[in-house]
Amino acid sequence: SGSPERFMSMMDGKKRQIDEEIRRLKNMKRFILHEEESVQLAMKAALDEPRLVERDREYLLVSDISAGSERKAAVEIAEHVRMQEKYHDTVGAVGSIYLGEDMDRGIYDRYVKVYTRLDKKTASRRVQSRPEGVYVELYSRGHLWDMEKPYRLISAFAGERGTRQGQTSHDALTLDHQTE
């Protein structure tokens, strides 16, 4: 027979587990709602038509990805997802960042970083802020690793307006279930 203290301690542990599970499920639900919203938006949006969009400052959890090895990249992406869930209490779509200079040289399939948008600023060396401003956005159907078509469309759009493109990055927030 256990002591009342031991029983109470065990119950505290159970309550903590339940609270943790509730938090995890709420995050999952928030992610699902966000994904639904993104897919609905993408379904309504005209494809392959660049447009200017005003965006607020965003906080991104960013991880570097090794170029070269697909297996290593997959492991690093899995680690990024684990980290975002464990330390940043968020479950979100993972976007990828490409270097503008790679694309200028015709390399459309090498992404150098992955990121997840966070709900709030967090103290971590991996969290970067993307400033508020006007961005060119484009919905395109295709594969994450082939950015040639979106890049050409966005470059032409920026060129027509005499706009300088962001010095380093083009990012792709891919909805896998959207691609065909």
Model-inferred region functions:
Residues P4-E180:
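A solvent-exposed interaction/effector surface
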